[in-house]
C-alpha cells in the first residue's frame, strides 16, 4: 500500500481553500525518506527543528510568504477535505479571529483536527513563548491565551459529532483501525467523515480496538 502521508496529501489536494501544501519535518536523518517522498510528489518539504515545532511551522510558512496558515497533522490520513474547507471558509469570512479551529473542544472524531490562523499571531506567540514544552506543540501558546488572541472553535453537528471515535494514528491499534477503513473504501471513490462514521457504526467492534488508548494530547484539550 501507499504511505500514510500519501493518503493525507491526496485528501488535502481535494480541498479548494489550500493554495500550497508544505510538509514540515525535522532535520533528523529518519525524515530523509519523507523528503524524498515529497520530491517524488513535487511537494515542498521544509526541514527544521525537532523540538521547536513553533519555529519550524513559522519558518515553513515564511518560506511561502504566507499570511495565513492551515495546520493539518501528519498522523491524520483520513482528514476530510470538506471539514478542512469549512474551517478555512469560516476564517476567511471572520477575519477578526487570529485562530479558528475545531480542536479547542473535541467534538469531531480525533483525526479531523484543522487549524487556520494569522501568521502575525503565530509570530507574536513565538516572540512571547519561552517554554520549550509549549513551543513543542506549535500553536499551543495561541490556544492557551484567549485573552491575548481572538479564538473561535468550530463544533461538529449532527452525525459528525462523535468525539468518542479516534481516526488519527498515534499507536499500532490506531493503524489497524485506519487500515481497515482505507481497505473498505479502496475502490477509489472519495469518502467523507459521514461515510467513515456510518461504516464504523455498522462494524462496532472496530472502534473498540483503539478506544481505551491513553492520549497524551487530551491534557491540552477540553473534551465533552
Model region roles, listed by residue range:
Residues 39-51, 62:
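Conserved donor nucleotide-binding strand/loop of the catalytic core
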Residues 66, 114-126, 172-176:
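Conserved nucleotide-sugar donor-binding
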Residues 80-107:
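Conserved donor-nucleotide/metal-binding helix-loop-beta segment in metal-dependent transferases, i.e.
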Residues 53-59, 74-90:
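Acidic donor-binding/catalytic loop of UDP-sugar-dependent glycosyltransferases
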Amino acid at each position: 500500500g501507499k504511505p500514510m502521508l500519501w493518503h493525507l496529501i491526496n485528501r488535502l489536494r481535494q480541498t479548494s481553500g489550500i493554495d500550497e501544501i508544505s510538509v514540515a519535518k525535522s532535520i533528523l536523518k529518519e525524515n530523509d525518506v519523507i523528503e524524498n517522498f515529497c520530491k517524488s510528489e513535487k511537494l515542498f518539504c521544509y526541514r527544521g527543528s525537532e523540538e521547536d515545532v513553533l519555529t519550524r511551522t513559522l519558518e515553513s510558512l515564511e518560506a511561502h510568504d504566507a499570511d495565513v496558515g492551515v495546520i493539518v497533522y501528519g498522523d491524520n490520513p483520513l482528514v476530510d477535505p470538506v471539514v478542512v474547507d469549512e474551517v478555512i471558509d469560516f476564517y476567511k469570512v471572520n477575519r477578526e479571529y487570529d485562530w479558528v479551529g475545531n480542536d479547542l473542544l473535541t467534538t469531531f472524531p480525533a483525526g479531523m483536527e484543522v487549524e487556520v490562523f494569522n501568521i502575525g499571531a503565530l509570530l507574536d506567540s513565538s516572540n512571547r513563548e519561552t517554554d520549550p514544552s509549549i513551543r513543542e506543540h506549535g500553536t499551543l501558546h495561541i490556544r492557551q491565551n484567549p485573552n491575548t488572541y481572538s479564538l473561535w472553535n468550530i463544533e461538529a453537528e449532527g452525525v459528525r459529532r462523535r468525539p468518542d471515535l479516534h481516526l488519527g494514528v498515534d499507536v499500532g491499534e490506531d493503524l489497524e483501525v485506519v487500515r481497515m477503513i482505507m481497505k473498505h473504501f479502496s475502490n477509489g471513490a472519495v469518502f467523507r467523515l459521514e461515510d467513515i462514521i456510518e461504516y464504523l457504526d455498522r462494524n462496532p467492534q472496530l472502534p473498540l480496538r483503539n478506544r481505551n488508548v491513553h492520549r497524551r494530547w487530551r491534557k491540552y484539550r477540553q473534551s465533552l
